[in-house]
Amino acid sequence: MAKKSMIEREKKRQRLVEKYREKRQQLKAAMADPNIDQATRMELHAQLQKLPRASSPTRLRNRCWKTGRPRGYFRDFGLCRNSLREMAHRGLLPGVVKSSW
């Protein structure tokens, strides 16, 4: 089980990413415009740099919603491999069956 502080830190990052998503996209789109001059591009870059560091989607880490484990994460379920296996054996994941061939 991950520390509570790590789980809460990740939740805070997710909130920040959502809060600044629109503004970040607008700034990046404006910077990508080939018709703007260099001074304007530098000003846009400065505005982008003023956004909180944690608001960048790159800083997000996928974590298991049950245990907070950051590794062995399955996107389809939002679970780590340990929790996925445990819940699948108990039949708590609809449509998941043991493999047999």
From Swiss-Prot:
InterPro entries: Ribosomal_uS14, Ribosomal_uS14_bac/plastid, Ribosomal_uS14_CS. Signal peptide: none annotated. Coiled coil: none annotated. GO terms for cellular component: cytoplasm; small ribosomal subunit. Keywords: Ribonucleoprotein, Ribosomal protein, RNA-binding, rRNA-binding. Gene3D superfamilies: 1.10.287.1480. It comes from the Bacteria. One of its GO terms (molecular function) is structural constituent of ribosome. Part of the 30S ribosomal subunit. Contacts proteins S3 and S10. Binds 16S rRNA, required for the assembly of 30S particles and may also be responsible for determining the conformation of the 16S rRNA at the A site. Belongs to the universal ribosomal protein uS14 family. This is Small ribosomal subunit protein uS14. The lineage of its organism: Bacteria, Bacillati, Cyanobacteriota, Cyanophyceae, Synechococcales. The gene is rpsN.
